[in-house]
Amino acid sequence: IETLGHRGDEPERLDRPIDPWDLQSIIYTSGTTGPSKGVLSSYLHLFTMATSSREMLDHTDRRLINLPLFHAGGTGNAYCMLVKGGSIALVDSFRTETFWDIVRDSGSTCVTLLGAMTPFLMKAPPSPQDRDHPLRNAFMVPLPADAAAFRERFGVQ
C-alpha cells in the first residue's frame, strides 16, 4: 500500500528557513458583515491562536469543534489541541437540540461558542441534565452579558 503523498525520495529542501511571519495558510472570516473574506495567516498568527488558552487546558482535554476548519475558530481550536497533546471531537455544525448530547457522547471538556450559540443554549428549556456533562470550559466570543448565568446554569467556566 502506498502512503499518501510519499514518493520514496527526500522532501524538497527549502530555499531558506521558515520565518514566523511567513504565510502558513488562508483562513476565512465567517461572513457576518458580508461575503466571507480570505485572511492570509502567518505561522505566528496560528501559533498565537493555538497557545492563547494554554493556562486553562492540558493534554487530558478534548475540544468540541463545531466550526468549519476553514474558519479561524475551527483552525485555531484544532491547533490548540495539537499543541496541548489533547484531542478533538469534530462535528459538522452547531445545533442547540443536540449540543449537550454531543458533549456527553464525545467526552468534550471545552468548546468555543460564537455569536448566537450561547443565547440559543440559554433559551433552551431548563433540564435536569443541564449539569450532567464533562464540559469544564466554554470560550464565548463575544462574551455575553449573561455569562455568569450560563456558568451557574451549566456549571461551566
Where are these regions (language model features)?
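Conserved structural elements of the adenylate-forming
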Residues: 7, 11, 20, 24, ...
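Conserved adenylation A10 loop of the ANL superfamily
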Residues: 26-38
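Short beta-strand->loop structural element characteristic of the AMP-binding/adenylate-forming
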Residues: 2, 37-40, 65-66, 87-93
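ANL superfamily adenylate-forming
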Residues: 1-20, 125
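Conserved AMP-binding/adenylation subdomain of ANL enzymes
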Residues: 47-62, 70-110, 120, 124, ...
